[in-house]
Amino acid sequence: MERHFEKVEEILKKYGYKRENLIKILLEIQEIYRYLPEDVINYVSTAMGIPPAKIYGVATFYAQFSLKPKGKYTIMVCDGTACHMAGSPEVLKAIEEETGLTPGNVTEDLMFSLDQVGCLGACALAPVMVINGEVYGNLTADKVKEILRKIKEKERESANV
């Protein structure tokens, strides 16, 4: 697939092609693509005069960057001790049953991606998952499936508008 770089170029211009703005630049690029594609990293490297290895170093050091496509809805399931004991394995199983996803993967339609993470800091609500920054706690398999079905329904409705 041939990619056009107009939006990337706008971001680079906005930040003056300055090295000290690399993290901001990468964050904005990731908002567009939902990850940092290799060809875009190479484009940024050439445009900014930064070796690709340096950009990959930044992209792999900071947890908020992804080199793999992410879904429109990024699901993070806590598997810290409290959540694990309270049922996070069942939460993961319910997500897999509803979406076909296993941790570290994305659905073919790029609707959902799933990450299994350490403590999310909401132990009192265990088991917990976060979808695009929204925390869902005290989960059961049925609650998880209901949440995901509502998201799917919302997406179907907005596609039909």
Swiss-Prot record:
Q: Does the keyword Transmembrane apply?
A: no
Please state the protein's primary subcellular location. cytoplasm
Q: So which domain of life are we looking at? A: Bacteria
Q: What is the effect of changing residue 122 to P?
A: Large decrease (132 mV) in the redox potential
- One GO MF term, please? metal ion binding
Q: Which UniProt keywords apply?
A: 2Fe-2S, Cytoplasm, Iron, Iron-sulfur, Metal-binding, NAD, Oxidoreductase
Residue positions binding [2Fe-2S] cluster = 78, 83, 119, 123
* Family the UniProt entry places it in: Belongs to the complex I 24 kDa subunit family.
Instruction: Report the protein name in the record.
Output: Bifurcating [FeFe] hydrogenase gamma subunit
Which organism is this entry from? Thermotoga maritima (strain ATCC 43589 / DSM 3109 / JCM 10099 / NBRC 100826 / MSB8)
Which gene holds the coding sequence for this protein?
hydC
